[in-house]
Amino acid sequence: MITDEEIRKVIAPLLLSGAKMLDKHCPKCGSPLFEKDGRVFCPVCEYREKKKREEMKGVEEVLMEKFKDLAFSLPKDVNELMQHLDAMEKLLTIIERYRKLEGRG
């Protein structure tokens, strides 16, 4: 189902830009398909995918920031250092998994 936000942010600007709304619908979300510059596409699915990628990128940025914080505050005590390194290793594993989900890993 198409939300009001998607109509405002995606469909209305497309119509104003000269894109043609077709009489066919997206099999995935039910939105009308559009044609612009010879390309037929579902603007709602593209918008949702872009939004999802941005959210995933935000998560990765938070994890990388935490990784940097740990890297710049390594303790001198060996036991504490091992805990820091374990946490850093786990963060790297999670970051790698996010990248795979995005198709970048």
UniProtKB/Swiss-Prot annotation:
Task: Name residues in a coiled coil.
Answer: none
Disulfide bond entries: none
According to the record, the signal peptide region is none
- Can you supply a Gene Ontology BP term from the record? DNA-templated transcription
Q: Which family does it belong to?
A: Belongs to the UPF0148 family.
The protein's name is: UPF0148 protein PYRAB12700
The protein's organism comes out as Pyrococcus abyssi (strain GE5 / Orsay)
Lineage of source species: Archaea, Methanobacteriati, Methanobacteriota, Thermococci, Thermococcales
